[in-house]
């Protein structure tokens, strides 16, 4: 079976996590063997392991994460989704495209009511608030490096009567938790992480 056929099958009939992960490892290993010169991946991994989890976090905060929510209201949609949206037909409004993308993330993450869920890099809370509303018995912990983002999310949660969402303000270099989670989600944050292996070792389920 080709990778395209296997991926199509997995999308039509969701498979258990352990099956998907095993398949992903095989595909990644096969691709690495084709496109990665010998030793390059190991050298890159060693270089990453010597770095902090996140670099230039303070600069990123000064540039945009610490700006007031009113600024982002000028160009983000009603969900304040600070990542890509989804336009299946190209005719969707920004708000509709936000909602469709959020629903896709929820579906692909295999989320369910009653789970302990951790979101790393929650932005302005679009996914966290969506999860909290959709899964009222779930317990959601959201991590952001921005005090304005935390204040905004907590205010929105109060407005919506959501009591199952806790927001933590923390630099990813310092974040650690002893809690166990059923799901860990992160949308468009890992490209900012220099040493993602160190981060995952702190938050693994």
Regions from the language model: what does each represent?
Residues 173-184:
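A short acidic, Gly/Pro-enriched loop at the edge of an enzyme's catalytic core
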Residues 2-73:
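N-terminal auxiliary segments of SAM/dcSAM-dependent transferases
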Residues 124-136:
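Conserved SAM-binding loop of SAM-dependent methyltransferases across substrates and taxa
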Residues 114-123:
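Conserved class I S-adenosyl-L-methionine
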Residues 159-172:
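Conserved SAM-binding strand-loop segment of SAM-dependent methyltransferases
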Residues 197-205:
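A short glycine-rich, Lys/Arg-flanked "PGG" loop and its adjoining helix->strand segment in the class I
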Residues 45-111:
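Class I SAM-dependent transferase core
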Residues 139-144:
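Conserved SAM-binding motif I beta-strand of class I
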């Amino acid at each position: 079976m080709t990778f395209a056929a296997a991926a199509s099958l997995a999308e039509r009939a969701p498979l258990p996590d352990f099956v998907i992960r095993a398949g992903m490892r095989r595909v990644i290993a096969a691709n690495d063997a084709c496109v990665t010169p010998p030793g390059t991946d190991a050298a890159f991994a060693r270089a990453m392991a010597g770095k902090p989890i996140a670099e230039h976090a303070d600069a990123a905060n000064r540039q945009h994460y610490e700006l007031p929510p009113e600024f982002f209201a000028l160009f983000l949609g009603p969900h304040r989704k600070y990542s890509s949206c989804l336009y299946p037909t190209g005719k969707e409004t920004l708000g509709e495209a936000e909602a469709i993308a959020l629903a896709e993330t929820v579906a692909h993450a295999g989320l369910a009511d009653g789970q302990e869920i951790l979101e790393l890099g929650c932005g302005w809370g679009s996914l966290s608030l969506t999860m909290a509303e959709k899964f009222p018995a779930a317990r959601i912990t959201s991590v952001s490096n921005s005090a304005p983002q935390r204040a905004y999310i907590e205010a929105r949660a109060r407005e919506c009567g959501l009591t199952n969402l806790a927001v933590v303000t923390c630099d990813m270099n310092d974040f650690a938790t002893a809690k166990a989670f059923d799901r860990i989600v992160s949308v468009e944050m890992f490209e900012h992480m220099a040493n993602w292996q160190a981060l995952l070792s702190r938050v693994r389920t």
